[in-house]
Regions:
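Conserved SAM/SAH-binding loop
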Residues: 39-41
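Aromatic-flanked redox-active Cys/Sec active sites in thiol-based oxidoreductases
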Residues: 8-12
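Short hydrophobic/charged patches on amphipathic alpha-helices used for structural packing
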Residues: 43-45
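FMN-binding flavodoxin-like domain, especially the glycine-rich phosphate-binding loop
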Residues: 2-4, 14-17, 25-30, 35-37, ...
Length: 153
């Protein structure tokens, strides 16, 4: 069975709320086990090599930057071969900044550079998830599991 990991950064709780809702969407249609890790726990990027399917979540800091908590992990990703891994990225965003959800784009590009198969376009939610965003997060989880399992057969 495919192994799933989700690593996220959340300062205000919005991205973690997204993470939990995405996991709900996944577990509604599959009994896969997802290891959920807060970036504050200090995981090393090498852990990604142990998993078949990767979800990363981050809010955008300042004017289009990764959160400081994600920087070491991001740099460590340069040394990881993710060829054959299924991946997608999500995050909470703030439209008051000029670069909306840039952290989602930055992480997506890094995963792609390291060989991961990006199975879904990044999911961006304005601040905290409203009712429509909750549905989108659940669908993101469902779509991720479907695309990850189908494409690994």
């Amino acid at each position: 069975m495919s192994k799933f990991i989700m690593i996220f950064a959340s300062m205000s709780g919005n991205t973690e709320e997204m993470a939990d809702i995405i996991i709900e969407g996944i577990t509604e249609i599959s009994d896969v086990n997802i290891e959920k890790i807060d970036i504050m726990e200090g995981p090393e990027a090498s852990i990604l090599g142990e998993y078949d399917c990767i979800l990363l979540g981050a809010y955008t800091w300042g004017d289009g930057e990764l959160p400081d908590d994600f920087l070491d992990f991001y740099e460590e990703m340069d040394h990881i071969n993710l060829t054959g891994k299924k991946a997608a990225v999500f995050g909470s965003c703030d439209s008051s900044y000029s670069q909306y959800g840039a952290a989602v784009d930055i992480l997506t590009e890094k995963l792609r550079e390291q060989g991961a198969d990006i199975v879904l376009e990044g999911l961006k939610v304005e601040l905290n998830p409203d009712d429509e965003d909750i549905k989108n997060c659940q669908n993101f989880g469902r779509d991720f599991i479907k695309k990850s399992l189908v494409s690994s057969i």
